[in-house]
Amino acid sequence: MQIYLDMCCLQRPMDDQTYLRIHIEAEAILGILAWCEAGNADLLNSVALEYEIDHNPHPSRKAFVQEALSKSVFTVQATDSVEQRAQHFGKFGIKVLDSLHLACAVEAQADYFCTCDYRFLRRAKQMDTGRTKVVSPLELIEVIEP
C-alpha cells in the first residue's frame, strides 16, 4: 500500500492542539506515520512536498516534516504527465500546489491521498483520480485499523 500525505497532513501534529478536531487529526497522522514506519505501507514523497519544505519559514515544522519524509520510499518527480494532471485538476478550482500534490499521488498510483484541508478534500473527491482514493486522516485510520 502506498500513501501520499499532503503538507497540511504532515504539519498537522505541529498545529494548535487546543481544538479537538485538530488534536484527533494530529493523533491520526502520527498513527499513520508510525504504521508506515513499521513497514505496513510506503510513504510517498514528491517534488511538491520538497518545494513546500524548502519554503517553510518555521524551523521546527520544517524539521518535523523532513524527519517524517526521510522514511519515504519514493519521490514523485514533476514529469510532463504530472504537470498535465495538475493543470487538469486546477481547472476545477483546486489551488496550484494542491493540484500538484494530487497529480503526484495519482501519477505514482498511490492507494491513498490524504489531506486535512476539507475544502480541497471535497473538491478532490469529485475528481477522477483512478485507483488513488482521496481521504481525510480519520478516513485513512479507519482503513488501516478497521
Question: What are the residue ranges of the model-derived segments?
Answer:
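Short, basic, glycine/proline-bearing loop/turn elements
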Residues: 14-18, 81-90
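Helix-adjacent hinge/juxtasegments
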Residues: 62-86
